[in-house]
Swiss-Prot record:
Domain THUMP: from-to ranges: 44-155
Family, as annotated: Belongs to the methyltransferase superfamily. RlmKL family.
Keywords in alphabetical order: Cytoplasm, Methyltransferase, RNA-binding, rRNA processing, S-adenosyl-L-methionine, Transferase
Lineage, uppermost ranks: Bacteria, Pseudomonadati, Pseudomonadota, Gammaproteobacteria, Legionellales
rRNA processing in keyword set: yes
This protein's name: Ribosomal RNA large subunit methyltransferase K/L
Annotated function: Specifically methylates the guanine in position 2445 (m2G2445) and the guanine in position 2069 (m7G2069) of 23S rRNA.
Length: 707
């Protein structure tokens, strides 16, 4: 007897799946983007469940019929002989997909199907199956399209990518059947038969290496699965099933070489070993903690297969370019005679490899469209797009501009004891970056390109940027840090973007300051306010100085070194602790200074303290949950300035600054106070190209205004 089946798969794998299923004995009747339809006997069905490496689900088609309305769906499900599929004492669940004019909700559709099944059994013997949505013994699929209802029984009960060996995964897990597809596209079974080795330098939890070992050793992926729905199928033949399982176990064969996985994260390497042990392939594989540039082949011939990180946003993509350049260099230098298969969603990262692909295949990692690039690593496949490759005409213009800026600003920075400064700020509009130097590091902040710029053009410019910057500035590629600068909303301004906690010390005049180039979009030091900070370095000893919205209190460090007594207010405990570290770094006695964690607006309303100098530099916008209200600097600057002026001694000075480019000072403030726009005096040499980086005002009471 033959059964009608539908075997689903990940998008893009349908024809690869068709070949696999034909090899396992399925008579294919139709191929669709969702999967493969076919006819199979019971032994073939069991072999599909045991041996398919690519399938998601294997569904036994039970019946189909016209059913536009609720009553028709219920009638079809009541009339079907469910006792030929399972008995009433089994637990069930329904997955419903599709809709009609009357049935628009999948939960409602599932309820109708379930009611039909229950009513059938009640009429048959007065009993009914129970529903278990979490772990049913019988999973029924119902699909309604064009008023045709198709109902099927899930023979395994869950997706076949769940082999049973992976209890935990790394940050970006690759599904087992997608990993298997990568290996099949890379011709791994044929290569393994010839004694080739295998190496995954980004192994994570080990999925690719484990799947490769199971293929090479001819281990059926279904052997590890427990509690499958076919065990509860009324037509299940346990003796035949066990016979085929035994035959599968007998087909396992040894490997001539160990397959290798490496990763820089020791925790995921340990996880990979645990997964390999559960899969029964631990003797066939080897997992080590190793950096990419330390990777070396263990055999003369082999396959490098990997799923490196490939960020989904443009800023993430460009930050990964150096990693892909290093991968290309390592493959070309150390893996001659090998094959390679590399999965990425980004053409710019594929290009950054600098190696020519023989073939490309489209695969989907979840919803993300990716390309698998298959390469032959040989002397004929020359390495391109390396840091030393010839520059395009546009890239050469960028190089010339950076070199010119470097020659000018380096001398100025040395003369003024400055080790952190802006060297480039979208000087050439097509290369929309700001580049800041911190000692021997460069932080590249990529302005989000307008929607009118095609993604491939933006990515090409990004790749050229990363090619040019190390060469023009004499900076090692590993010391480039790429971030994407965009208009920030709410708490985004201070949100973490990483967890490296790598700090550095920079110099600014007499002050030493701590910066973190990795963990946040901002580094802990606003370079454009340097001249304001240096102005505070000239305060008289004993000056009472308030730094409101103090951030890491770098301005206060300069003031304290001059002998001022500082009060530093900020809502963030993280930044206040950072501020205290800045003070300690400069051997400043903390007992003479205050670090207060408050909502600055609320604190200014209630404090009775008075100050000689106040620096007020609020964010342009903030909606932090810990604030009593949303801060919008254009709307709120009048009240903030009034509150700050209340805290000044009669002859005191308020310096108000904002980075809101379109900021307009409310005219009434000039009627109430003596206001001087000192923005030009606060723009240092490295920001002359972008004089609108901030607005700065000196505000005093009218009778203390400068004559």
């Amino acid at each position: 007897m033959n059964y009608s089946l539908f075997i689903s798969c990940a998008k893009g794998l349908e024809y690869l799946l068709e070949d696999e299923l034909k090899g396992l004995g399925l008579h294919v009747t139709q191929v669709s983007p969702q999967g493969v339809y076919g006819e199979a006997s019971l032994p073939v069905i069991y072999n599909l469940c045991l041996w398919s490496r690519l399938a998601n689900r294997i569904q036994l088609i039970l019946f189909s019929g016209h059913a536009a309305k609720e009553q028709a769906v219920h009638q079809l499900c009541t009339d079907f002989h469910w006792q030929t599929v399972f008995t009433h004492d089994k637990t069930i669940a329904i997955e419903f997909h599709g809709a009609s004019e009357q049935i628009r909700n999948t939960m409602f559709g599932a309820q109708i199907v379930k009611d039909g099944i229950v009513d059938h059994f009640r009429r048959l013997n007065g009993s009914r199956p129970s529903v278990d949505k979490e772990k049913p013994q019988i999973l029924i699929h119902a699909h309604l399209k064009n008023d045709i209802l198709t109902v099927s029984f899930d023979l395994v009960g869950y997706s076949l990518h769940q082999r049973g060996y992976r209890k935990k995964a790394g940050k970006a897990p690759l599904k087992e059947n997608v990993a298997a597809a990568m290996l099949l596209r890379a011709k791994w079974p044929e290569l393994a038969a010839q004694g080739y080795g295998l190496h995954d330098p980004f192994c994570g939890s080990g999925t690719l290496v484990i799947e490769a070992a199971m293929m090479a050793a001819h281990i059926a992926p279904g052997l590890l699965r427990q509690d499958q729905s076919l065990q509860y199928w009324a037509r299940h033949q346990s003796s035949l099933w066990e016979k085929l399982r035994t035959q599968a176990l007998q087909q396992v064969k040894p490997l001539a070489v160990k397959l290798v996985g490496t990763d820089t994260d020791s925790k995921v390497v340990a996880l990979a070993r645990s997964n390999a042990e559960r899969a029964g392939v631990l003797p066939l594989v080897e997992f080590n903690t190793l950096s990419l540039n330390a990777c070396r082949p263990g055999t003369k011939r082999g396959l490098v297969v990997c799923n490196p990180p490939y960020g989904e946003r443009l800023g993430e993509v460009t930050q990964l370019v150096p990693l892909y350049q290093q991968l290309g260099t390592t493959l070309h230098t150390c893996y001659q005679g090998w094959q390679a298969a590399i999965l990425t969603s980004s053409p710019v990262l594929a290009k950054a490899l600098g190696l020519r692909a023989d073939k490309q295949y489209t695969l989907y990692n979840g919803p993300l469209e990716c390309k698998l690039y298959c390469l032959t690593l040989s002397a004929a496949n020359k390495l391109k797009n390396t840091p030393n490759a010839p520059l395009s005409d546009n890239a050469q213009m960028l190089f010339n501009r950076l070199e010119k800026n470097r020659n000018h600003l380096q001398k100025w920075a040395r003369k003024n004891q400055i080790t952190c400064y802006r060297i480039y700020d979208a000087d050439l509009p097509e290369y929309a970056y700001a580049i800041d130097i911190y000692n021997d590091y460069a932080v590249l902040q990529e302005y989000a390109p307008p929607a009118s710029i095609p993604v491939h053009k933006a990515e090409k410019r990004s790749l050229e940027m990363l090619q040019v910057v190390p060469r023009a500035l004499g900076i090692h590629p590993e010391k480039l840090i790429v971030k994407q600068r965009k208009q920030q909303k709410g708490s985004e301004q201070y949100q973490k973007i990483g967890k490296t906690s790598q700090r550095q010390i920079v110099t600014e005049g007499k002050a030493k300051l701590i910066v973190n180039l990795y963990d946040y979009l901002d580094t802990g030091l606003f370079l454009d306010h340097r001249l304001m900070r240096l102005k505070f370095a000239q305060l008289e000893q004993g000056t009472r100085f308030l730094n409101c919205f103090c951030y890491t209190a770098s301005a206060s460090v300069h003031a304290a070194l001059a002998g001022a007594l500082t009060t530093n207010v900020d809502l963030s405990k993280t930044y206040l602790l950072w501020a205290e570290d800045n003070f300690r770094l400069n051997d400043i006695n903390l007992s003479k200074h205050q670090f207060l964690q408050y909502d600055c607006k609320e604190w200014m309303k209630t404090t009775r303290d008075k100050f000689d100098v106040i620096f007020l530099d609020p964010p342009s916008f903030s909606n932090s949950k810990r604030m009593s209200d949303i801060l919008d600097i254009q709307r709120d600057h009048v009240s903030l300035i009034n509150m700050a002026m209340r805290l000044l001694n009669p002859d005191g000075v308020l310096y108000f600054s904002t980075n809101l480019r379109q900021f307009k000072l409310e005219p009434m403030l000039k009627e109430k106070y003596a206001v001087q726009d000192i923005t030009p005096q606060t723009i240092d040499q490295d920001f002359k190209r972008n004089s609108k980086i901030h607005h700065c005002f000196k505000i005093v009471m009218p009778h203390f205004a400068d004559n």
